[in-house]
Design a protein with these regions (language model features):
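A structural signal for small-residue-enriched, beta-sheet-centric alpha/beta enzyme cores
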Residues: 1-240
Length: 240
């Protein structure tokens, strides 16, 4: 069965926040996933990472793989904003740690990305510290999905992509656990689109061709960031 919200925030303690940038030149943003109610650096949440396609510019995955822990919230943005978002995330975590009496000398911010250059002037690097802080301030259990935050500039199956989320509740013995997922979708050719088990892509492609829509011939390329969260008692190797 699905969780109460059918979202990653059905996992206890997880929050999601967005900041969306929509201007004449830029259609982009940032999404933050806060893994729990406590200081992530102090708690070092059990974590793992998996790279399906290595043509990406994500930050922080190497240490997650090495140590099996997550010590910051996760941020998603566009490709050329990874550095600026990393810097903002580091600053926010340092502030949180100092407020909790900690003085970190090394921090591993985790930032994922998709390239949204098709509808966003990505070279402008429109996401900075202000936008990251706004995303943190907006973090909640009841977050928006679709054309928001890091999904503002993404394209999926030749149509508008965005942020999506879902959850499932499973039973092991007499105890219930929740698995939640959040995606930033930016991939796929229209002809391969399947909705609720039905291959609707070819029909959409035919309609686009009738309308002389040039986007109908897009190649199957792009990327997707997938963030999974769970309250299952697993090790980093089991998560992998």
């Amino acid at each position: 069965k699905t969780g109460k919200r059918n979202a990653i925030t059905d996992v206890p303690g997880v929050l999601v926040g967005h900041c969306t940038v929509n201007t004449e030149e830029n259609h982009t943003g940032v999404t933050v996933i806060i893994p729990g109610p406590d200081n992530a650096f102090a708690n070092h949440y059990t974590a793992a990472a998996y790279v399906h396609n290595g043509f990406g510019k994500s930050a922080g995955l190497v240490q997650v793989e090495e140590l099996g822990t997550l010590e910051t919230p996760i941020a998603l943005t566009n490709t050329l904003n990874v550095g600026r978002v990393w810097d903002a995330l580091a600053g926010i975590v340092i502030e949180q740690c100092q407020n909790d009496g900690l003085e970190p000398m090394s921090i591993n911010p985790v930032v994922g990305e998709c390239n949204d250059c098709r509808i966003n002037q990505i070279q402008k690097r429109a996401v900075g510290e202000k936008e990251v802080r706004q995303a943190f301030a907006a973090a909640t259990e009841e977050f928006e999905e679709g054309d928001v935050g890091a999904g503002t500039g993404t394209i999926c199956y030749g149509m508008k992509g965005g942020i999506g989320s879902a959850s499932r509740v499973i039973c092991i013995g007499e105890k219930e656990y929740t698995i939640g997922v959040l995606v930033q979708s930016n991939f796929g050719a229209t002809e391969d689109f399947i909705l609720n088990g039905e291959a609707v892509g070819p029909k959409i492609l035919e309609w686009k061709q009738e309308k002389n829509d040039m986007a109908a011939s897009e190649e199957d390329k792009g990327s997707i960031m997938s963030i999974l969260a769970t309250d299952l008692p697993l090790t980093s190797r089991q998560l992998k």
